[in-house]
């Protein structure tokens, strides 16, 4: 995966078990967001592949790809919502899979007594937004909009959740609520991959992968993230630790690096390499 002469991602291999909870950390520009864009096919690979159930994601038909995407829920730092619509409709889009089902949206608009409207209200209440279903999304704060995005995941109930820096622009209360909700979805069976900059949040995950300059340099328990390793991960990052460890503190990651990129997830298996 390249954006210039230097590869944005190189020699990345990740294997994720169904139902696993995984955090991806690294300095700004380490390749975290690029990895997530590749997994959602938002950007094209220059080499390697992404496969679903053994089939290359880049060779699937539009219909087949749509079926895969219905199983994947996404949440981003920049809220992927329609700001002009009420919060409740943005949540409902998680169930209908986009703007295609106008009938479902009209059902919601028909009134607060409809079954869908009640379910949306209950979901928004679960994320701390009771009574906001008919509030225009653009009129909500940034933290509230992120909660709307999480509520949409609750309605969608995806098998795989890809969360790209979901806490970067929200307040501590929202961070805690969003984290708890994502973990609840994970406990209910969803596989959870979260791209993070905050190591303190990453320590709540049983497994952490660290990228630096597009390559994996750590894959394991957060308990093994020593200050020396964190210094190497965040070297040169104004939001991380500037010092780079001495060569003797660097560690062998050959066990975690095979090929160029590979991801395996879910009952059918999702992989990229």
Residue ranges and their predicted role:
Residues 40:
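Helix-to-loop junction immediately C-terminal to a conserved catalytic motif
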Residues 49-67, 108-110:
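ABC ATPase NBD Q-loop/coupling interface
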Residues 136-140, 144:
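Conserved ABC ATPase signature
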Residues 155-159:
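A short, proline-enriched helix->beta-strand linker immediately N-terminal to the Walker B motif
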Residues 161-164:
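Catalytic Walker B motif of ABC-type/P-loop ATPase nucleotide-binding domains
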Residues 172-174:
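Helix N-cap at the start of a conserved alpha-helix in ABC-type nucleotide-binding domains
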């Amino acid at each position: 995966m390249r954006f210039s002469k230097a590869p944005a991602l190189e020699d990345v291999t990740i294997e994720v078990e169904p139902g696993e909870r995984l955090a991806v950390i690294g300095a700004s520009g380490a390749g975290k967001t690029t990895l997530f864009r590749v997994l959602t096919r938002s950007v094209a690979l220059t080499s390697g592949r992404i496969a679903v159930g053994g089939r290359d994601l880049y060779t699937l038909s539009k219909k087949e790809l749509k079926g895969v995407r219905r199983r994947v829920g996404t949440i981003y730092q920049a809220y992927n919502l329609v700001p002009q619509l009420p919060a409740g409709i943005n949540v409902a889009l998680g169930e209908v899979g986009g703007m295609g089902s106008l009938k479902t949206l009209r059902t919601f608009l028909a009134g607060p007594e409809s079954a869908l409207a009640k379910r949306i209200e209950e979901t928004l209440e679960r994320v701390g937004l009771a009574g906001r279903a008919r509030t225009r999304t653009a009129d909500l704060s940034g933290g509230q909009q992120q909660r709307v995005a999480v509520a949409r995941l609750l309605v969608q109930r995806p098998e795989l959740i890809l969360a790209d820096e979901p806490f970067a622009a929200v307040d501590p209360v929202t961070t805690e609520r969003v984290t708890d909700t994502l973990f609840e979805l994970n406990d209910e069976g969803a596989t959870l991959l979260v791209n993070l900059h905050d190591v303190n949040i990453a320590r709540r995950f049983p497994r952490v992968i660290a990228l630096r300059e597009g390559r994996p340099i750590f894959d394991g328990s957060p308990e093994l993230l020593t200050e020396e390793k964190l210094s190497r991960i965040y070297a040169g990052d104004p939001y991380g630790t500037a010092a780079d460890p001495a060569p003797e503190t660097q560690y062998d990651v050959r066990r975690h690096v095979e090929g160029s990129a590979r991801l395996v997830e879910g009952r059918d298996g999702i992989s990229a390499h």
